């Protein structure tokens, strides 16, 4: 009987040790995989601007008639943190994305709002055309909009970033 208890204790300690090793390995991998983060300026450096895009001092207004052909969606294939406000209107097709931990389908005539620092991932794009306004936080501050006054609005947008029109 003592040997049975000893065997159970030995295997339980061994399993516990194996579990601790497994958890350390997983946590180590999670720590190594950091979420990519970039600003509007970096996004423009990577993707470039088209002649018809309007850009002024940290604010971009742009349209992409065929998102797949005109924009590098691979940047958002994995969770990414974009440090800019973005208001995106989908006029055609659809985009399936995840904002934070919530999955959204941004369909035709849908407005999507991204807050700075939120995590965004694009899963698929189906024949989408979009119109977008992207602004760095500093741009909003320079034009004297008091972000504290918009706290309630930001809380609602954070809960419901996608709005069918």
Predicted regions and their residues:
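Generic protein-terminus/edge-of-domain signal
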Residues: 2-95, 104
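N-terminal regulatory/effector-sensing and dimerization cores
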Residues: 61-162
């Amino acid at each position: 009987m003592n040997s049975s208890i000893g065997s159970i204790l030995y295997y339980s300690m061994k399993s516990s040790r194996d579990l601790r090793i497994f958890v350390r390995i997983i946590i180590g991998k999670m720590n190594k995989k950091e979420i990519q983060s970039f600003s509007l300026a970096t996004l423009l450096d990577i993707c470039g601007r088209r002649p018809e895009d309007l850009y002024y001092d940290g604010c971009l207004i742009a349209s992409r008639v065929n998102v797949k052909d005109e924009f590098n969606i691979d940047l958002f294939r994995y969770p990414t943190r974009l440090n800019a406000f973005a208001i995106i209107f989908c006029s055609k097709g659809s985009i399936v994305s995840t904002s934070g931990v919530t999955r959204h389908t941004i369909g035709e005539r849908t407005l999507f709002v991204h807050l700075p620092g939120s995590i965004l991932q694009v899963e698929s794009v189906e024949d989408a055309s979009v119109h977008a306004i992207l602004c760095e936080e500093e741009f909003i501050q320079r034009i004297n909009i008091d972000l504290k006054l918009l706290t309630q609005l930001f809380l609602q947008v954070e809960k419901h970033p996608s709005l069918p029109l």
